[in-house]
C-alpha cells in the first residue's frame, strides 16, 4: 500500500491533487499533522487501502527529524511517497490575485510576495526529499489531475462509472442526474392487479414489458444515444455519469428499463452501477 504525502507551496494545486488521488481510490486526509501519520497508517493497515495526506506550511514539523521519525514509525505494509507541487513565483501571485484568498502566512503581517518566499524556505526540507516534483505553472486543473493519473496509474483516462438509477416522478427528480429520461408513456404494469405488488426486478413484470415493441425501441434508442456520446464523456475528466430513468412511482417501468440499460453497458465492459431509489426507500 502507498502513503502519498502531498505538499507544496500554497496555490500550487495541492487540493486538486488530493481530489485526483481520491478519484483514484486513495483514502484522503487534508492537512494532517505529521506526527499523526503513523496513527492514520495503522488505522488503515487492516483495510488494505492506500492513503494520501496533504501537508502545508501550517502543519510543518519544527525540524526535518520529526518528519523522518514519523516515517520510520509507519507500518511495514505502507510505502511512503512524497509528492511536491510547485509553481513559479509570478504564477502563485497571479493565482492569489485571481481568487482573492489570503496566503496561510499572511497573518504574520507579511506581504503576499514575502509570504510566498518565506513559505518556500520553510518547505525546502520536504522539497529536497520529494520523490516527484511537479511544476504546475502552465497547467490547468484538469491537466494536473491527468498527469497524476498517468504517473501513478500508468494510464491517461480515469475509468468512468456509469450509474443507472430509477426513480418516481412523484418523489422528485434526482439532483445528481446528468441525464433524465421519462418512461411514463410506456405500458404500465400497475394496472394489472397481479403485477401491482411486484417491481421491475420481478420476472412477471419483465415479461409484461418485454412483450411491447415500444419498450424495446425506447431501450435501443436510449442506449444508442448514450453510446454515441460516451467516448467524449469518458475523456471529459469526470468520474461518474448518472442516467436517471423515471416513471410515475419508480417501481415498475423505470426499474426494468434502468436494469436493461445497466446490463447492456456492463456486457460491453463498462464500469456500471444500478440503483433504484423508490425500492431503496421501501427496505
UniProtKB/Swiss-Prot annotation:
GTP binds at residues 56-59. It comes from the Bacteria. Keywords: ATP-binding, GTP-binding, Nucleotide-binding, RNA-binding. One of its GO terms (molecular function) is GTP binding. Residues 266-283 are annotated as: RNA-binding. Pfam families: PapZ_C, RapZ-like_N. ATP binds at residues 8-15. InterPro entries: P-loop_NTPase, RapZ-like, RapZ-like_N, RapZ_C. Modulates the synthesis of GlmS, by affecting the processing and stability of the regulatory small RNA GlmZ. When glucosamine-6-phosphate (GlcN6P) concentrations are high in the cell, RapZ binds GlmZ and targets it to cleavage by RNase E. Consequently, GlmZ is inactivated and unable to activate GlmS synthesis. Under low GlcN6P concentrations, RapZ is sequestered and inactivated by an other regulatory small RNA, GlmY, preventing GlmZ degradation and leading to synthesis of GlmS. Homotrimer. Belongs to the RapZ-like family. RapZ subfamily. NCBIfam families: PRK05416.1 (NF003828). This is RNase adapter protein RapZ. The gene is rapZ.
